[in-house]
Amino acid sequence: VLPGNKRPTIKDVAAAAKVSPATVSLALNSKGGVSETTAERVREIARDIGYTPNALARGLQRSSIGMIGLVIRPLDTLESFLPAGVDFFLRLTGAASLAALERGYTLMLVTDPSKPDSPLSALAADAYIVTEPHENDPVLTMLAGERIPFVTIDHDPARPDAFPAFRARATNQVQTMLAHLVEAGAQRVALVTGTDPNAWNIESRDEYLKWCAASGRSPQLLSYPETAGSAVGDDVIDALFGASPTLPLSSPAPDAIFCLTGRHAAGVTEAAIARGIRVPEDLLVAGGSGAIINQTSKPTVTTFDLQPEAVGALAVDAAVKLAERKPLEGPLESPPALIQVRESTTRSQH
């Protein structure tokens, strides 16, 4: 029995039995795939530590409760479930909620259901939508192990073809923004990514490095936690315009900075102006996922509209089909991101 009042989880059983959570799930649900010896040992350990399978989750395979679960993975690493100046998640969740109601379902927003302290209701939905999963994401591993249907918004970069996913097309977004910056006059473009191990960060970095190699440019690549928000501005300007161990001192300062998050872009713009670097005259600044602050800052900042309302509605449609054990037809296509050119990349034509 575990110490204190901690409720034993499938992970605790797996650790005690020295097997994977997926193996525990197979053993406890008598689904085959493991030897009877292993299954009996797992069941015995589960009894010993007091593990009780989630009755709601196990009942999913027999009946429907008319609920879709939404797991927004970036919120699990941000400083708040309501990050200041960010409307992407609100737009996504609102559209998904209404789309679910339209289909006769309700939407339940949950945090990481694979955590030991997650509530019993976290695995109660008929199907799940998981946004921006991480490499080898434990949420996907758990859902797959429990045979609970799910669809992802963007894919697990370590398992790109393992699960149904609406791909975010990070490669296309990077290509589009780099082309825009060059057309606006940029010659040396730096990229600032986040640190979450998701496909958006990884594929954007890879595409940027590929572009640098193909065009004979020296990469100027920095990464900062998404949770830092606009506070990264001074660090980015220090690294790119002052002596820093992050980049060779011989690297010329960039004339454009592309930040994958809108809050990073806002912080960089503010910090540059505070140092006397004019935006956009001396430095072009652009963001990937736009934030409200990018539309109200001075200057306003060029970003993408990732169309979260459309993505949310499409994901709900797919999740409902999975919940009703209907096949998903054809590849899952996300709507293209729309570049919104604003003052930070628009220079006066004189």
Annotated model-derived regions:
Residues 241-350:
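Flexible loop/turn connectors
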Residues 2, 51-117:
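Amphipathic helical "hinge" segments at domain boundaries
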Residues 187-189, 219-221, 279-284:
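Short acidic capping loops at alpha-helix termini that bridge into adjacent secondary structure
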Residues 134-175, 263, 289-301:
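Flexible loop/hinge segments that line or gate small-molecule binding clefts
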Residues 1-66, 349-350:
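N-terminal helix-turn-helix DNA-binding module of bacterial transcription factors
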Residues 77-79, 83-88, 112-116, 166-176, ...:
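Hinge/beta->alpha junction and helix N-cap segments in small-molecule ligand-binding domains
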Residues 20, 66, 126, 187-188, ...:
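Short acidic/polar active-site loop segments enriched in Thr and Asp
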